[in-house]
Amino acid sequence: DNNEPPTPTKKKRDNTSKTKLKNRKKEAKKKTVTVSTTDPDCGLFVKGDHKKQLAYEAHTVCDVHGVVLDVEVTPGNVHDSVPFDDLYDRIVEKFPQVHAFVADSAYKTPHICKKVFGDDRVLSTAYKRPMTMKGGHEWWKYVYDEFYDCIICPEYQVLNYSTTNRDGYREYKSDPKICANCPTRHLCTHSKDFIKTVTRHIWKDYEELADDARYTPIYQRMYKARKETIERVFADAKEQHGMRYTRYTGLAQVKNWVKLKFAAM
């Protein structure tokens, strides 16, 4: 049945070392942070190359009727996936009967996919373009062989498993002797030692379940309904309830203001 929800795969055995990793050495990294002199609590919201402003974000959950169920307000420089855990936990506690969540591509992360599918629920998201080398081989030309746990490159060479890094990504590396004479190496890697490294998250299988849901008819219809539900909530909030611009300063005041507005809507 095409409407059957994707099911989590069996947990694979990880043959990596079980020894505890040492704590990372904290390096003093200098970075430029834009801070408002009027409201230091807000953050710089960036959306592509066309939108950049100091703002707050209202991470909002609504039901199929467009009724706001919960909201989390953060500075504009906080990624959408950061407040997800708190929102998700509160929603499933209040409404345990919920079986599916629909969200945009910002929420398609390994952690979020594992959290939702691990609870026997379904996450339907938009397509998320893989981040690959500009002008290089397409991402889908690197094929993962689940049986042998290796990556096959566009030239049909094997990249064997090397290690699992601290961020939860399994690293697969090529043979530099083969890559040194590869005719398409310029499309693959600019590494001086001729080693191509491909990473795959240990929870990638859960991300693939989200892709499966994207092609399932029932979840396709649910995703298309976003424009009539959550997007309509944001549109009405901005156009009819004066929420296009922040009227207060300070995170606490803005949070109370947003919750009061959504309660009235």
Where does each model-flagged region fall?
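Anion-binding and metal-coordination hotspots
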Residues: D1-M265
